[in-house]
């Protein structure tokens, strides 16, 4: 039974998305349906957490919009996420960056990872 579930999940997992980590700044292209029209909206921010794994994996992106912190959680394998672009790679020592919620301005910056 478990093998059947794993097989179904394996065929539905997306492989076209880049590998990104917590701390990276990403642009998430999301399909939004308004009535009969469908458009793509871009949400750019820092990945502050990744949760679960496999087909149920989600990630949360945080950004400041007009001085107000906005967080959105996206399923990694959802068809509404059309594309994920990595803007810059961040260097962090935590799996969850909730401390960024209390910081404003330059204090909320994440160091860049160099390769």
From Swiss-Prot:
Database matches in PROSITE patterns: RIBOSOMAL_L19
A GO CC term attached to the entry: cytosolic large ribosomal subunit
Pfam families named among the record's database cross-references: Ribosomal_L19
Organism domain of life: Bacteria
Sequence intervals crossing the membrane: none
Family, similarity comment: Belongs to the bacterial ribosomal protein bL19 family.
Name of the protein this chain belongs to: Large ribosomal subunit protein bL19
Organism of provenance: Clostridium tetani (strain Massachusetts / E88)
Gene: rplS
